Amino acid sequence: MHTYDFTPKYEKLLTPDIVSLLTQIHEYKGEQALFIEAKADALTKLVEIAKIQSTEASNKIEGIYTSDERLKKLVQDKTTPRTRNEQEIAGYRDVLATIHESFDYIPPKSSMILQLHRDLYKFSGASYGGHYKTSDNVIAETDALGNKTVRFQPLPAWETPEAVDSLCRAYEEAVGKGELDPLLLIPMFILDFLCIHPFNDGTAMSWLRR
């Protein structure tokens, strides 16, 4: 059984440089209300650009591509997906929209992670959407000659559900204390989640839920 405790790792991350960056980010966050009011149109355009870039980058991680023109139309929900790749891009678009619009109401729980993963594949109808991996997997690298090297061995499939539950509980407990900055807790959660690698497909895209 894997247990997670964010506090020891968190304390090691509190270097002067990181503390300075956290302070600056929180200062800028306090000023953003004025920016939103004064530059609403510019902010809307930036959000749309960010959605397109996020969709492109996250799907490329999974080897999913389409043309720039098709990608833009899919993200803007102005066309119907034609291929399997486009179906998965459309699923990502909808999940990203759900998170963008309702992030305050999305708890870091196993059931919610599975729901978002299911929605990633709602257009393709993939049977593994919304289910944790059913077989063990490895993170491997293939060189130019076709030789594979195992770079990382994630948790076995049978340990995955309990590990995700444990990780989510540890994160909620850490946030609930109010003593640890979520700006550091979030990337720590994501790294542990990726190390579990809980899905047969779509793990790299699933970290966007946070």
Name each model feature, range by range.
Residues 1-210:
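FIC/Doc superfamily catalytic core
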